């Protein structure tokens, strides 16, 4: 998605440890017009998947997930990272390691909002090692729902997440594919049909 790549080039910052900081438009300050376009793009890519719900993990995945749900006309569920006083029983859970924060969080989704007939699209802001998506896959397995794919805003192609998900048969659609962050520069992987 060229618009997203341009935004990354303009506002993204490469930090030590192969971290791409995009807090100017995605995971701190949010560009709502870009998020709307991201949601529309995911909806177009998965238009024939008969999606009934969109799932994400709080908090950076919420904006693109909500816009995807809006474009598809389906509800959005975000897996909570912290225990809630109002959601204290009847939960599906999984442990997820955060590459950027170097911590493990237990994510949870209420059984109340999940139906065994659901066809779920997973949305995440980044795909590096695939831990957030893997956690959502574990919850989907516990719930007995079908995952139709994973929509990723920014994929780090030089890390194993996408290949590991593909090996499990998960359809991955990434809007920006970063091939390298070497020397503080963001390089993108060209996709078929691009010059």
Swiss-Prot record:
EC number: 2.4.2.22
A Gene Ontology biological process term: purine ribonucleoside salvage
UniProt binding sites for xanthine: 20, 27, 156
CDD domains, per database record: PRTases_typeI
Residue sites binding 5-phospho-alpha-D-ribose 1-diphosphate per the record: 128-132
One GO MF term attached to the UniProt entry: xanthine phosphoribosyltransferase activity
Gene Ontology cellular component terms for the protein in this record: cytoplasm
Task of the protein: Converts the preformed base xanthine, a product of nucleic acid breakdown, to xanthosine 5'-monophosphate (XMP), so it can be reused for RNA or DNA synthesis.
Entry's family note: Belongs to the purine/pyrimidine phosphoribosyltransferase family. Xpt subfamily.
Protein name listed in UniProt: Xanthine phosphoribosyltransferase
Origin species: Limosilactobacillus fermentum (strain NBRC 3956 / LMG 18251)
């Amino acid at each position: 998605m060229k618009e997203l790549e341009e935004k990354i080039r303009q506002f993204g910052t490469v930090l030590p440890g192969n971290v791409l900081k995009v807090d100017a438009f995605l995971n701190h300050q949010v560009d709502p017009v870009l998020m709307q376009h991201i949601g529309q793009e995911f909806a177009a890519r998965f238009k024939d998947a008969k999606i009934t719900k969109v799932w994400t993990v709080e908090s950076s995945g919420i904006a693109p997930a909500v816009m995807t749900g809006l474009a598809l006309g389906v509800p959005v569920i975000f897996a909570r990272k912290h225990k809630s006083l109002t959601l204290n029983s009847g939960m599906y859970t999984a442990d997820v390691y955060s590459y950027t924060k170097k911590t493990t969080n237990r994510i949870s989704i209420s059984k109340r909002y999940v139906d065994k007939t659901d066809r779920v699209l997973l949305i995440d802001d980044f795909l590096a090692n695939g831990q957030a998506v893997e956690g959502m896959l574990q919850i989907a397995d516990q719930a007995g729902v079908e995952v139709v794919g994973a929509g990723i805003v920014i994929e780090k192609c030089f890390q194993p997440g996408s290949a590991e998900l593909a090996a499990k048969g998960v359809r991955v659609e990434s809007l920006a594919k970063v091939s390298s962050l070497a020397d503080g520069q963001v390089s993108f992987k060209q996709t078929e049909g691009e010059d």
